[in-house]
Structures are given as C-alpha cells and as structure tokens.
Amino acid sequence: MAGKNQSQKKKKSTAPMGNGQPVNQLCQLLGAMIKSQRQQPRGGQAKKKKPEKPHFPLAAEDDIRHHLTQTERSLCLQSIQTAFNQGAGTASLSSSGKVSFQVEFMLPVAHTVRLIRVTSTSASQGAS
C-alpha cells in the first residue's frame, strides 16, 4: 500500500504545468503565437506608414483646410462645436431648407502664425 501511495504522489508532481492545461495545448498555443509574430514585420524592418492626410475635395484651392495639421483640425472642430453649443455665431435656415452656420474664432497664436506663414508662401508661389 505504501508503494501505491508513493507512485500516486509522483504522478501528481509530474502533472502538466500551466494552470491545469495539458502540455500539448500549451505547445500548440506557443507555436501559434510564434507563427503570428513571424508574420508581423519587426519594428526595425517595418516601414512606418504616414497617417493618411485628409483631403477636402469640396474645398477651394486657397482654402486653409489644406494646410491644417491634425492638431489644428481638432482645435477647429472643437471650437466650432463649442461655439455652436453656446449659441455663438449665426445659424439660419433658408427658404430652400438649407441650414447655414457661420462663426469666427481664433486658434492659439503659434498655430495662427504658422498658418499665416504657410498660406503666404503658398500664395506667393502661386503668383510666380
């Protein structure tokens, strides 16, 4: 009887590790993880994609939206929404059913200065 208890204890101590999952399942999982990592390009080898620059197909050529950075676009949208929600600007409805909303706001000085420089250089390049 004593021999039987010892062999049972040995079987328990050699039980698969990994929170009760059989070793086979753990190996399959590890293999799948390695396979998926091989399919993904490594950090140093991958070409970093630039975020796609939004285009404004309905905007005129001289529209400043073509020159806005992502931060500036976000600031503009936030300012427009805040102005609308607080009742700033002018909102109207035409007889044809078109809604119009017009508002003026200022961006932070650094962004304004950058936009003035960018738009003035593009305007002077267009003139020459």
Curated annotation (Swiss-Prot):
Keywords, ordered alphabetically: Host cytoplasm, Host nucleus, Host-virus interaction, Inhibition of host innate immune response by virus, Inhibition of host IRF3 by virus, Inhibition of host RLR pathway by virus, Ribonucleoprotein, RNA-binding, Viral immunoevasion, Viral nucleoprotein, Virion
GO cellular component annotations of the record: host cell cytoplasm; host cell nucleus; ribonucleoprotein complex; viral nucleocapsid
Keyword presence, Nucleotidyltransferase: no
Cellular compartments annotated: Virion; Host cytoplasm; Host nucleus
Gene Ontology biological process terms, A to Z: symbiont-mediated suppression of host cytoplasmic pattern recognition receptor signaling pathway via inhibition of IRF3 activity
Main location: virion
Transmembrane segments: none
Disordered as annotated region, ranges: 1-60
Keyword Nucleotidyltransferase attached: no
GO molecular function, one term: RNA binding
Alphabetical list of Pfam families matching this protein: Arteri_nucleo (PF01481)
Function: Multifunctional protein which associates with itself through both covalent and non-covalent interactions to provide the basis for viral assembly. May play a role in the regulation of cellular gene expression during infection by interacting with host HIC. Plays a role in the inhibition of the dsRNA-mediated IFN induction pathway by inhibiting host IRF3 phosphorylation and nuclear translocation.
Subunit record text: Homooligomer. Interacts with host PABPC1 (via C-terminus). Interacts with host HIC; this interaction may regulate the expression of different cellular genes.
Family the entry assigns: Belongs to the arteriviridae nucleocapsid family.
Protein name: Nucleoprotein
Organism whose genome encodes this protein: Porcine reproductive and respiratory syndrome virus (strain Lelystad)
